[in-house]
UniProtKB/Swiss-Prot annotation:
Keywords: Capsid protein, Cleavage on pair of basic residues, Disulfide bond, Fusion of virus membrane with host endosomal membrane, Fusion of virus membrane with host membrane, Glycoprotein, Host cell membrane, Host cytoplasm, Host endoplasmic reticulum, Host Golgi apparatus, Host membrane, Host nucleus, Host-virus interaction, Hydrolase, Ion channel, Ion transport, Lipoprotein, Membrane, Palmitate, Protease, RNA-binding, Serine protease, T=4 icosahedral capsid protein, Transmembrane, Transmembrane helix, Transport, Viral attachment to host cell, Viral attachment to host entry receptor, Viral ion channel, Viral penetration into host cytoplasm, Virion, Virus entry into host cell. The chain crosses the membrane at residues 697-717, 774-794, 797-817, 1235-1255. Glycans are attached at N283, N537, N598, N960, N1089. A lipid is attached at C731, C751, C752, C1252 (S-palmitoyl cysteine). A motif (Nuclear localization signal) lies at residues 68-109. Its EC number is 3.4.21.90. GO terms for biological process: fusion of virus membrane with host endosome membrane; proteolysis; symbiont entry into host cell; symbiont-mediated suppression of host toll-like receptor signaling pathway; virion attachment to host cell. This is Structural polyprotein. Structural polyprotein: As soon as the capsid protein has been autocleaved, an internal uncleaved signal peptide directs the remaining polyprotein to the endoplasmic reticulum. Residues 731-751 are annotated as: Transient transmembrane before p62-6K protein processing. Residues 363-366, 399-401, 521-524, 553-559 are annotated as: Interaction with host Mxra8 receptor.
Length: 1258
């Protein structure tokens, strides 16, 4: 379902045209009013001045004297109609009616509100649940939209039966509007200039991308209401709000140009109207916010109130009932929340004494400030400590910042908060305290101690083994927040004591045995409660037992026969594993302050490195202040990823290949660099300069060519020498064997031999002409044939050396086409343009420019589960004295339960048992998601087929624009009247594996166990579908152990969290090692700007884009002169064209050769006959055909290599193995080969001549 509506009809409700009524008189003819008389500005100012003076005079005349008292203005009373008095019976008198207070007058809606109400009358409908309005649904475009969190059914029979599709990402439900209701829909717009907009309650301000209203203008129940602009178009739909003091920030769903956006400020609450929940008390159902008077509140009936809360602990309205039970003054009226209000729930609780393994002296004890739990989920290093004492409360439960209350025996006492100490290896900084909780920042250490001094000047402490290490935030170590740096997202414990989503369980305290209340006088045993509730059990006489608050005596009894216990069931205490559980298993709960919240933390920025560029590399001079992380990767198909922590000043040389390098230093943004084809020497100089030039670019090829050339020259010399020696031997051998023979003059000159008798050349030629003319002509044909063969080979060798080169910033240029339907193939690389020249008969050529702006490869994901850190919940053990207990299975993750017998001796420790045998302890433990799971969790997904979306910039003629479409061969995109279809892409590739893990903004390609098959200590040991669902699965190897004699506790063993282990061993994320330079992002998971494959594009160019030849300028005498040229460096060439024209205009510019590409797509033709253009090339001596309008010319240049070794932009290079030779290099090569060829030709010629002469002699 697309959540962008289609605008099909924007009118209000359609009304039929009234039928013709001939009997009704026609309306009068309308005459336009006369034109207004022009107003004189001076006369108008004079009239305003006279009116102001008259008004001032009237006010002065009505002013009272200084001594006159101001009379109170009486309200206007309606005059009663006077009636004649009636005779009244004096015996009967009427009771006087009490005057009724005037009803408050309703405020008249303002102009904005009236306008919105008029539009809302047709386009919004109420959503009702159990007859009560919970929100609204809105008709926008061709869709009906309703917030997903608004429960209920739309109050319309046609809309109620629609099938809605839900989007949890946008918190929206969407369905198609019935056809007969499309006229009621409102228009929508994505245009949102900053200013004021309208909604049901007045004005809405839009500033810096946020919608805000005055606090109090919106309320729960407004979810789903639209926000309109001044034209009545919907710009957003309200979902909720966040109170920010004087103003409230709205959470809305709005539209951008091509997508839906959800704006959710921090602390947003959903504005759905809450349906009143019902609580139960003794089969009586009542509103949770209005409990009955028995019990009405905690002060009137403490135990009854706790029982009522325990019975409704799982009710959704529990906290409403808790708040109402702690406010006995006026529970029905609205209460203003404050700091004191947040402490109200602690009236129902009390501190407690619990087991501590080290009370500061190396010995265990039962401490009033025992440490229950230490939490360190905050990424800024804060600790959240839970203790058994309560901070910020007095003895009576009243709020006081300066007090700590604690248990002393059976009584609650308080002392000064200033005596509170928290330290590890050093003193901690306490940021906030409330109830059982302390938030502090501590130095690193292996133990944690909390201590205080009571009012009797006795110091109480508790120390536990806790390894505290401050987490590294960002990519640089630091100990103190810097003055200057960069803000990174982090988590911290917010200093808020208001109601949160976290809670702790409470229960009624166990009865505490104490025989100090017993005394004996004579043969009587007396119980003196001393103001407490005492549970007694005496085995003497009639075996009496019960509960008393008064003194009580037993005759004929001994103190040893009676047992007394202090029972107090009017207070809750924390469900601690170090305190026995009460007899009843009921429990309550209260909120936990200081919730873990998302925030931003300032982290330092290391000094920027000094960079020294080199050929195909860069040297970084690093000077870190603290240990700083350096990472880099190449951007090719096989990325090489490296990570290193730098602690001291040093230098690191990084290779920069042609495909690019990305490095990240500390908390700075990533830097991308690309290598350029820089070299020494010159392609147009002397041979040694040419050798240096090509050796710097293509060392292997240059060496191979030089070695081959040297071999050819040596072979030529050797062959020529061999031929000469052979010819000499053939010439001289016959004369050497004949005595007295004289060598002819010709042979003596050719063979360097003394003259002998032989025929002369003329005689030999005459002899061959007379005897064998065939051999005579062969003497002349053989040298000519050799010369022709050598010339032909040299010609083709020069043509082969001039290979075609790739463009520096472009793919290959396309040829001309004869129709407006055009197909191109774009490289899937951001920043590389494509140019083409489209020819159409009767029209001037049209230059087409296309460039990929961005791409996004988004896979289809299926969530398997979410995993995070677990929390082990250990309830208070259930100690049964003189009896047995049995485990009851509970639907909890990794639930464990065991019963241990004989663990407590008679009257021992905190077990409070009076039997010396058959004392049992029931231990329980299970696993839950930790509170940090909402902020720190990993999601396991199965990735399917990925869809590629590309944004392409197109320029043709005078039209340019950007379009975005899926690259699938079907989706259509338009820019003006241009229609194009992208894809499918040539290479179906995705950087994502079939199974991926998403953690915050990082993605990992890794396998994971399926749901329900997690292993202890590994990824997936705790699994759930979402961070709030109840389907929690856990396998943590949780095992209960037998408690040791001497303490009340629940020992257990458990494998450490597999999620935390995975965080340490997860390795490098795909974000840092994705191939082809992909940028990996989340929400949604996608890979952006992956440079792989090609994108075919089918274009349908409109006829209006072409210019007829008769309208285009005509150019003659077109000439091209290259001013400067730097190859392989963006558009580093500049050329000047000269021409003659008959009129001014605009001509399309295009290079018809693949050697160069033009930066400009058109040239403004002027009567000056001169223009400047820029081009890009990868050739050292390019020669290309430039076409301007219908005229052509050839441009030739001699280019120099770029000077910068490394640049921050990508550039393609000539990647062929055999390089492109310059004309100068080819000239020198031709001369060298020609010299070797001449040497060989001379040797061959001599050999052939000698051979022919030898044949002629025989």
């Amino acid at each position: 379902m697309n959540y962008i509506p289609t605008q099909t009809f924007y009118g209000r409700r359609w009304r039929p045209r009234p039928a013709a009524r001939p009997w009704v008189a026609p309306p009068p003819v309308y005459y336009p009013p006369p034109p207004p008389v022009p107003v004189d500005p001076q006369a108008q100012q004079m009239q305003q001045l006279i009116a102001a003076v008259n008004t001032l005079a009237i006010r002065q005349n009505g002013t009272r004297t200084p001594g006159q008292q101001r009379r109170k203005r009486q309200p206007n009373k309606p005059k009663r109609k006077q009636t004649p008095p009636k005779k009244q019976n004096p015996a009967k008198t009427k009771n006087k009616q009490k005057p009724q207070p005037p009803k408050p007058k309703k405020r008249k809606p303002g102009k904005r509100e009236r306008k919105c109400m008029k539009i809302e009358n047709d386009c919004i409908f109420e959503v009702k649940l159990e007859g009560k309005v919970t929100g609204y649904a809105c008709l926008v475009g061709d869709k009906v939209m309703k917030p997903a969190h608004v429960k209920g059914v739309i109050d319309n029979p046609d809309l109620a039966k629609l099938a809605f599709k839900k989007s949890s990402k946008y918190d929206l439900e969407c369905a198609q509007i019935p056809v007969h209701m499309k006229s009621d829909a409102s228009q929508f717009t994505h245009e949102k200039p900053e200013g004021h907009y309208n909604w049901h309650h007045g004005a809405v301000q839009y500033l810096n991308g946020r919608f805000t209203i005055p606090t109090g203008a919106g309320k729960p129940g407004d979810s789903g209401r639209p926000i309109f602009d001044n034209k009545g178009r919907v710009v957003a739909i309200v979902l909720g709000g966040a109170n920010e003091g004087a103003r409230t920030a709205l959470s809305v769903v709005t539209w951008n140009k091509d997508m839906v956006t959800r704006i959710t400020p921090e602390g947003t609450e959903e504005w759905t109207a809450l349906v009143t929940t019902a609580c139960i008390l003794s089969n009586l159902t009542f509103d949770c916010s209005l409990p009955p008077c028995a019990p009405c509140c905690y002060e009137k009936d403490a135990e009854g109130t706790l029982r009522m809360l325990e019975d409704n602990v799982d009710n959704p309205g529990y906290y409403d009932l808790l708040a109402a039970s702690t406010h006995c003054d006026a529970p029905q009226r609205r209460r203003r929340r404050g700091l004191t209000e947040d402490y109200k729930a602690y009236k129902l609780t009390k501190p407690y004494i619990a087991y501590c393994s080290d009370c500061g002296n190396g010995q265990f004890c039962y401490s009033p400030i025992a440490i229950e739990r230490v939490r360190a989920e905050a990424s800024d290093g804060m600790l959240k400590i839970q203790i058994s004492a309560q901070i910020g409360l007095q003895v009576d439960g009243a709020h006081s910042w300066t007090k700590i209350r604690y248990m002393k025996g059976h009584d609650v006492e308080d002392t000064d908060r200033n005596s509170l100490e928290v330290f590890t290896t050093g003193e901690c900084t306490v940021h906030g305290t409330m109830g059982h909780f302390i938030v502090a920042t501590c130095p690193e250490g292996d133990s944690l101690t909390v201590a205080f001094v009571d009012k009797h000047k006795v110091r109480h402490a508790c120390r536990i083994a806790y390894k505290h290490r401050v987490p590294v935030l960002g990519r640089e170590h630091f100990t103190v927040r810097p003055h200057h740096g960069v803000e990174l997202p982090c988590t911290t414990y917010a200093m808020r004591t208001s109601v949160t989503t976290e809670e702790i369980e409470m229960h009624v305290a166990h009865d505490v045995p104490d025989n100090t209340f017993l005394s004996k006088t004579g043969n009587k045993v007396k119980i003196t409660p001393k103001g407490k509730s005492i549970r007694y059990n005496c085995t003497c006489g009639s075996k009496e037992s019960g509960v008393t608050k008064q003194d009580k005596e037993f005759d004929n009894c001994e103190v040893s026969q009676c047992h007394t216990m202090v029972t107090a069931h009017d207070k809750w205490q924390f469900n601690s594993p170090y305190v026995p559980r009460a007899g009843s298993g009921k429990k309550g709960k209260i909120h936990v302050p200081f919730p873990l919240s998302n925030s931003t933390c300032r982290v330092p920025l290391a000094p920027l490195p000094n960079t020294i560029p080199a050929k195909n590399g860069i040297t970084l001079q690093l000077h870190p202040v603290a240990p700083t992380l350096l990472t880099y990767r190449t951007l090719g198909e096989k990325p090489e990823h490296h990570t290193e922590w730098i602690s001291e000043s040093c230098e690191r040389t990084l290779p920069v290949p042609e495909e690019g390098l990305e490095y990240t230093w500390g908390n700075h943004a990533p830097v991308r660099l690309w290598a350029q084809l820089t070299t020494k020497g010159s392609a147009h100089g002397m041979p040694h300069e040419i050798f240096s030039y090509y050796y710097g670019l293509y060392p292997a090829t240059t060496v191979a060519v030089c070695v081959g050339l040297a071999c050819v020259i040596l072979l030529a010399l050797s062959a020529s020498c061999c031929l000469c020696v052979s010819a000499r031997n053939k010439c001289l051998t016959p004369y050497a064997l004949t005595p007295g023979a004289v060598v002819p003059c010709t042979l003596s000159l050719l063979c360097c031999a003394p003259r002998a008798k032989a025929a002369t050349f003329a005689e030999t030629a005459a002899y061959l002409w007379a005897e064998n003319q065939t051999v005579f002509w062969m003497q002349f044909a053989i040298p000519v044939a050799c010369f022709m063969i050598v010339t032909y080979c040299l010609r083709h060798l020069m043509l082969c050396c001039r290979t075609a080169s790739f463009l520096v910033a472009v793919s290959l240029g396309m040829g001309a086409t004869q129709a407006y339907e055009h197909s191109v193939t774009l490289p899937n690389a951001v920043g590389f343009p494509y140019r083409a020249h489209v020819d159409r008969p009767g029209f001037s050529p049209l230059t087409l420019h296309m460039e990929v702006v961005s791409t996004s490869l988004e896979p289809t994901l299926a969530l398997d589960y979410v995993t995070c850190e677990y929390k082990t919940v250990v309830p208070s053990p259930k100690v049964t004295c003189c009896g047995m207990s049995e485990c009851a299975h509970q639907q909890k993750a990794d639930f464990q339960c065991k019963v241990y017998t004989g663990v407590y001796p008679f009257l021992w420790g905190g077990a409070y048992c009076f039997c010396d045998s058959e004392n049992t302890q029931l231990s329980e433990a299970y696993v839950e998601r930790s509170e940090v799971c909402k902020h720190d969790h990993a999601a396991a997904y199965r990735a399917h087929t990925a869809a590629l979306k590309a944004k392409i910039s197109v320029t043709y003629g005078s039209t340019n624009g950007t379009a975005e479409a899926f690259v699938n061969g079907e989706s259509t995109a338009r820019i003006g009247d241009l229609k194009m279809i992208l894809g499918p892409i040539s290479t179906a590739w995705s950087p994502f594996d079939p199974k991926i893990v998403v953690y915050k903004d990082e993605v990992y390609n890794q396998d994971y166990p399926p749901y329900g098959s997690g292993q202890p200590g590994r990824f997936g040991d705790l699994q759930s579908r979402t961070t709030e669902s109840n389907d929690v699965y856990a396998n943590t190897a949780l095992k209960l152990a037998r408690p040791s004699a001497g303490t009340v506790h629940v020992p257990y063993t458990q494998t450490p969290s597999g999620f935390k282990y995975w965080l340490k061993e997860k390795g490098d994320a795909l974000n840092h090692k994705a191939p082809f330079g992909c940028i990996i992002k989340t929400n949604p998971v996608r890979a952006e700007n992956c440079a792989v494959g090609n994108i075919p594009v089918s274009l349908d160019i409109p006829d209006a884009a072409f210019t007829r030849i008769v309208d285009a300028p005509s150019l003659t005498g077109l000439k091209c002169e290259v001013a400067t040229c730097t190859h392989s460096s963006d558009f580093g060439g500049t050329l000047v064209v000269e021409y003659k024209t008959d009129k001014v205009g605009t001509c399309a510019v295009h290079s018809e050769s693949n050697t160069a590409v033009m930066q400009e797509t058109s040239l403004s033709v002027t009567m000056d006959g001169r223009g400047t253009l820029h081009f890009s090339t990868a050739s050292a001596s390019p020669s290309f055909v430039l076409k301007v309008c219908s005229s052509k010319t050839t441009c030739t240049a001699k280019c120099v290599p770029p000077k910068d070794h490394v640049v921050p932009f990508p550039a393609n290079h000539n990647n062929v193995v055999f390089p492109d030779f310059s004309s100068t290099a080819v000239s020198w090569l031709t001369h060298t080969m020609g010299g070797a060829t001449v040497v060989i030709a001379i040797g061959i010629t001599i050999f052939l001549i000698v051979t022919c002469i030898a044949f002629s002699r025989h």
